[in-house]
Amino acid sequence: MGSSSKSKNSGGDIIVQGSILAIAQIIVRLIGLFYRIPLQRIAGDVAMGYYGYAYDIYMLLLLVSSNGVPLAVSKLVSVTRAKKDYTNEHRIMFSSVLWTLVVGSVIGSVTFIFANQITRAVFGPEMMGVVPALRVLAPTVFLCCVMSTFRGYFQGIGTMMPTAISQIFEQIFNAVVSVGAAAILVSQGPAWAAMGGTLGTCIGALASTIFLLIIYMLYRPQFMKKVQKDRLHKPQSYKEIYKVLTLTMAPVVLSSVIYQISGIIDSSLYSNILTGLGYEPDLISSLYGIYSSKYKMLVNVPLAMATALGLAVVPGISTAMINGNREEIHEKIGTTVKFCMIIAIPAAVGLSVLGGPIMELLFNDSSALTRNLITIGTPYLLFYSLSTVTVGALQGIDKMKTPIVNAAIALGIHVVFIVILLQFCNMNIYAILYSNILFGFLMCLLNQLALKHYIGYEQEAQKTFVIPAAASAVMGVVTYFVYKGIYFVLHVNAVATLLSIVVAVCVYAVVLLKLHGLTEEELYAFPKGTMIIRYLRRFHLL
């Protein structure tokens, strides 16, 4: 009885901690969206193209240098903490900090010194406007490396709060400095405006690192007392610690690098092939700026919400795997995918219906290109949400290499497809859009086949896909006519768009509940679930 209770409490704690991080991620994405609006208007599409190119390289360097660190550190620290092995917990923390200081310094320095050569090799000599932005991002790699150790440590001792607060803190500084610096430097040209935008990323990382360092230093005296009293545990050698760190990080880094390198390959092929076809450099950069800073920023908000909710449940899959309970594993994966789709499907439909008006509202851009990108590109949101969750499920059942192999296969097909679309179909920025949709679809398909092969898992369809799709279809039709009606009467896009979004949320929720897409038991799992159920009963929706 006690064991069962403890297991439930542990599972509840995992969900609570995961939810804290999920909420922080949603807030961070929303801040990111809202500060990009003035940044885009101040800097312009060409500058945002340079910004997007520099950011692609920065993200790859960040993944190589620090992406696996939080997971590795949190995993090792949680094991030593469970054994009350404070001696080796301290040695793991020391080793991790030293690791990130060295790796971050080397990668940051190489990026700064060879920014010209990197830009020329990846994007071609016509895109040298990327260099100033890339140089500003070089020290950011170092800061994020160090930051990742502290985030991993706090997660390892069982609290997500420092990580969550630091992420929000980082994004606020990023927003303020990016917009301010771009406004000051835009008169010097697009390359300098892009550099101003990336300066915010650097200052945000610095602020977040200082915050985490202060929290750690406040906690350290209490922790060091435990280390000094620990006489039961023999210190591990640093060689052994680094070996375990490396083995833990490698699969995560490889999987993430394949995901991110697809973006670099896209931008590199796009830039070089279009240059060869005779496109002007400013047009190439401008189109990419619209794609990376308008379309992707907008899609990433619901994507963060869908994947964060799903990933908050994934740790439970690992627990069920350890217990050898296949039925529980199936239930955990099914619940994760279902909640992900309940958010991703209506978000995709909503963006396809209101994509143009939202783009006009946020970016004052009513062009056919931006409208088409968001309307046509919404399947990307569905496939990437689902593929992220299924990657987590495979990692949860200890099949760490499988997502890497699947991503490599999908990437190979993706590269062939984008070259054909760019070189022979002259589809410019649409080539990246369609290729990314294909990549996401292939990842979903391959991951699902792997789950069926390893644990005999097949996704339930009716409540996961059919009912949310039906509710979303009703929502889409109603929303379309509501927007058209309000705009016809008022001729104010902002009012029509915002009211239509409110109507869309209400219609979707009502139809989903009436079709029994969510059970009362599932609603209890939501934050404030009891209160939600009470109100739903009052309105006869349950």
Regions found by a protein language model. Give the residues of each.
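N-terminal membrane topogenesis motif
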Residues: 1-31, 87, 91, 232-259, ...
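Signature of the first transmembrane helix
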Residues: 13-74, 79, 108, 112, ...
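Membrane-interface junctions at transmembrane-helix termini in multi-pass inner-membrane proteins
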Residues: 143-166, 379-409
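Interfacial/gating helices of multi-pass transporter permease domains
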Residues: 40-60, 128-129, 190, 194-198, ...
